[in-house]
């Protein structure tokens, strides 16, 4: 399943979880829901329409766990989700290259001062994939350009 195809769904809300939930909480919510909607757990006298809804919900829950239950796919999903949120917030104020940003050895991140006095910050790991970075003090956004 391609991650791009699944970004339209909010996998956290499908599991009834907060995006800041840890892996243990996500697993607990998944297990609770999967038991509730598992086709084998439904009674035989459930109407066909309801059974189909339960099956669809079961599939969605399983898909959510396949993405959120794996550290690598969860990280990619979270990053893309964050970028989508930024894209919906407002227009890009500027385009910058990583070389234009300063290095913070303390927390191993790159940063750039914003005209409001705040900072655009991106971790070393996120810098490889991130394209949009929001200011920590205002609504401005910069686009991080990657070398081609």
Swiss-Prot record:
CDD domains: DnaJ. InterPro entries: DnaJ_domain (IPR001623), DPH_MB_dom (IPR007872), DPH_MB_sf (IPR036671), J_dom_sf (IPR036869). Monomer and homooligomer. Iron binding promotes oligomerization. Disulfide bonds: none annotated. GO terms for biological process: positive regulation of ATP-dependent activity; protein histidyl modification to diphthamide. Zn(2+) binds at residues 114, 116, 135, 138. SMART domains: DnaJ (SM00271). The DPH-type metal-binding (MB) domain can bind either zinc or iron ions. Coiled coil: none annotated. Residues 10-81 form the J domain. Disruption phenotype: High embryonic lethality at 14.5 dpc. As early as 10.5 dpc, embryos are smaller than their wild-type littermates. Embryos that survive long enough to initiate digit formation show one or more additional preaxial digits. Keywords: Cytoplasm, Cytoskeleton, Electron transport, Iron, Metal-binding, Transport, Zinc. Detected in heart, brain, spleen, lung, liver, kidney and testis. This is DnaJ homolog subfamily C member 24. GO terms for cellular component: actin cytoskeleton; cytoplasm. The gene is Dnajc24. Pathway: Protein modification; peptidyl-diphthamide biosynthesis. The keyword Cytoplasm applies. Belongs to the DPH4 family. GO terms for molecular function: ATPase activator activity; ferrous iron binding; zinc ion binding. It is found in: Cytoplasm, Cytoskeleton. The iron-bound form is redox-active and can function as electron carrier. Stimulates the ATPase activity of several Hsp70-type chaperones. This ability is enhanced by iron-binding. Plays a role in the diphthamide biosynthesis, a post-translational modification of histidine which occurs in translation elongation factor 2 (EEF2). Residues 92-147 form the DPH-type MB domain.
């Amino acid at each position: 399943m391609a991650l791009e195809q699944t970004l339209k769904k909010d996998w956290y809300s499908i599991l009834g979880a907060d995006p800041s939930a840890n892996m243990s909480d996500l697993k607990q919510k998944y297990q609770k829901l999967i038991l509730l909607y598992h086709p084998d757990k439904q009674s035989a006298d459930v109407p066909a329409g309801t059974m189909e809804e339960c099956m669809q919900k079961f599939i969605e829950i399983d898909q959510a766990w396949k993405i959120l239950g794996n550290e690598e796919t969860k990280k990619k999903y979270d990053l893309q989700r964050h970028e989508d949120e930024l894209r919906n917030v407002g227009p890009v104020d500027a385009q910058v290259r990583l070389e234009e940003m300063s290095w913070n050895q303390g927390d191993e991140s790159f940063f750039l001062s914003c005209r409001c006095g705040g900072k655009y910050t991106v971790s070393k790991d996120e810098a490889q994939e991130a394209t949009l970075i929001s200011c920590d003090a205002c609504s401005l956004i910069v686009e991080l350009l990657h070398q081609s």
